[in-house]
């Protein structure tokens, strides 16, 4: 996964006991999703109980960083940006930003890949760009 250069400062996430492993992984350039060892489903956001079968036999699983745009919206303003739902190759759909692209050429179903924005505070925020 690559590190992107933001136009505007990306705020560091508030990290707590439940989210620490997730954010530690992003600082290393990895995006983890939850995976259930009982039913095999991947899910996002990672949490201790599987949202599909309610098993507590869950773990973090690194995802490929590949996905497709499910839907998106471009917000035009002083600093235009795109917010989108991206469906990961592993199955979960996540809310994220699409960066470093021509907003006018985005399309639902378009392939995207993971990039990280360094917050400058020891963490990185996962976002996507056109593949």
Predicted ranges, named:
Residues 118-131:
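OB-fold/S1-family single-stranded nucleic acid-binding modules
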Residues 1-31, 130-131:
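A broadly conserved sequence feature marking short terminus-proximal activation segments
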Residues 30-33, 47:
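Residues immediately within or flanking Cys/His clusters that coordinate Zn2+
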Residues 101-113:
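Short nucleic-acid-contacting surface segments enriched for D/E, G, S/T with interspersed K/R
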Residues 37-40, 54:
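Cys/His-coordinated zinc-binding microdomains
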Residues 67-69, 98:
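Conserved hydrophobic positions within beta-strands
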Residues 92-103:
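Beta-strand/loop nucleic-acid-binding surfaces
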Residues 72-78, 117-119:
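Short, conserved beta-turn/loop elements at beta-strand boundaries and strand-helix junctions
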